[in-house]
């Protein structure tokens, strides 16, 4: 994501610090595991907050937790519950585990899972995801209220967006309170 915007990791970390991001997520769908590992080690050396890796749960020893999308979970096991149980057993209870959710049904399903948070959205369409179906808009509040987990609003969220039932605004993979 940063590459497509011409933003270096150093610039991104500087912005995350300026905006007091408590958690950042490293997401690179195109890189191999060794490259991701090197990037996680580098980020860990320059950022003191929580670092989450997207998808690459095998690399959790280099960060504080893992985030998985619905498709990524189903690639592990068609049964999302089994997939989360497997990933939780691999990453351990001391690591953060979160998943993406897109509607009330997925949020209610996530309530039965051993998670630390959910990402909920998309709130708006974004530059990278223009053709999203199911934009939540203002309904994000009602759906977020159904979650027993901390909620991060994802997809098209801006710094000035305010929500009652959302803990974090996820902006460019940085979670801001």
What name fits each language-model region?
Residues 37-55, 79-102, 131-159:
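Alpha-helix-loop-beta-strand connector modules within alpha/beta enzyme cores
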Residues 12, 51-68, 102-116, 145-176:
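Catalytic cores of alpha/beta
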Residues 90-119, 124:
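Internal catalytic-core helix/loop-beta-alpha segment
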Residues 27-31, 98, 128:
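Conserved short-loop catalytic and cofactor-binding motifs
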Residues 10, 17, 21-90:
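N-terminal active-site wall of soluble small-molecule enzyme domains
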Residues 1, 68-84, 117-133, 156-177:
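Glycine-rich phosphate-binding active-site loops on the catalytic face of alpha/beta enzymes
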Residues 1-10, 95-101, 158, 176:
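Active-site mouth loops of central-metabolism enzymes
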């Amino acid at each position: 994501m940063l590459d497509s915007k011409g933003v270096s990791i150093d610039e991104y970390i500087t912005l995350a610090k300026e905006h007091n991001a408590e958690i950042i997520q490293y997401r690179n769908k195109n890189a191999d595991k060794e490259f991701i590992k090197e990037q996680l080690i580098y980020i860990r050396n320059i950022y003191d907050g929580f670092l989450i890796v997207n998808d690459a749960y095998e690399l959790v020893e280099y960060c504080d937790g893992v985030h998985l999308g619905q498709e990524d979970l189903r690639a592990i096991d068609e049964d999302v519950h089994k997939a989360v149980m497997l990933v939780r057993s691999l990453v351990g209870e001391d690591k953060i585990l979160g998943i993406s959710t897109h509607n009330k049904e997925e949020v209610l399903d996530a309530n039965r899972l051993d998670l630390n948070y959910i990402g909920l959205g998309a709130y708006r369409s974004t530059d990278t995801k223009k053709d999203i179906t199911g934009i939540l808009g203002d309904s994000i509040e009602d759906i977020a209220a159904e979650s027993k987990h901390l909620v991060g609003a994802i997809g098209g969220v801006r710094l000035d967006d305010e929500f009652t039932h959302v803990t974090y605004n996820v902006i460019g993979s940085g979670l801001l309170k």
